[in-house]
């Protein structure tokens, strides 16, 4: 049997992992400006953590979860999304305690798992970056979080992004709308897809979100959630819209957007961009004021979003956005002869300890091959070290771009290479 990676997974090789590191580092920098701190949760959880919070009737739970019984007969699932594990952690670690500053702001990044048909930008093991904010029901929190997502997408270079906005109201408004939707869809049941016929019984709002052609036709004239908002829900949504407008953020009201998870209420949103004629959601989230209490904590408001890293990178690639990845070596040492081997090791280590990104040849190759390696690594400077240089303790350092050279001592390189680096036209941080 030829050993290969499982279907729906990928190896992220060095040429690509640099892009991942850039995106993750960029997200950390943006989130830090908004006072978010990182939280890391296990990649597997008790099955009930996901099934009861995400919703027993959602596609994630009924079709897509990787779940199993471990050797202790505990029902375990690989996490399919990030919010439920973070809420579980928030409650379990009593981060709702009075001494913890509110609102509490967390971000996470890491692998998630869903058993679905692999396609471009969607894998069975995928990676998500997300944020969760606990303790504020102020609509300004909704807006701040949405704007933070927009800030990230704009600064990283995603183009043509449109904000789609909707509300699911409070539980009372949602219940009234749910019944109106059932009344509207029941006479049309036979025209719906099989999945939507099931959803009509279990979670009728999910019919609005269906991508099937027959379902899209059926919901064209469906009642709007906006007609069923009570005063509290209307006031909250109006405040969100007004604040977005005050900040100059354009949005589209999308009453068919419901999100695929059951825990949302009030504001929900998606950032969508068009790629090759298809609308792709790059980031999505919303408010979930009942989830902390559902996990056994006190009544606590919550708001958050998630974005898929694979999809984000796919969109950046399709839009021709080149991430500013710095892979260049500062120094490459070409080694000539066995007599230079030990000194080359000492020298490259001294350079690294001074903070330079340095590499040397280990394969005793001809100089031409070593110089080619220096070019492949985009080395800024090149040192050729042979037995004669070791004996004289003098070496030539070359700017590998302009070919300018300086003659220096090995001691200077070992102790103060930054002076030479700057003399050759480069700047140290």
UniProtKB/Swiss-Prot annotation:
One of its GO terms (molecular function) is transferase activity. It catalyses: tRNA(His) + L-histidine + ATP = L-histidyl-tRNA(His) + AMP + diphosphate + H(+). PANTHER family: HISTIDINE--TRNA LIGASE, MITOCHONDRIAL-RELATED, HISTIDYL-TRNA SYNTHETASE. Its EC number is 6.1.1.21. CDD domains: HisRS-like_core (cd00773), HisRS_anticodon (cd00859). One of its GO terms (cellular component) is cytoplasm. This is Histidine--tRNA ligase. GO terms for biological process: histidyl-tRNA aminoacylation. Belongs to the class-II aminoacyl-tRNA synthetase family. Keywords: Aminoacyl-tRNA synthetase, ATP-binding, Cytoplasm, Ligase, Nucleotide-binding, Protein biosynthesis. Its main location: cytoplasm. Coiled coil: none annotated. It is found in: Cytoplasm. Homodimer.
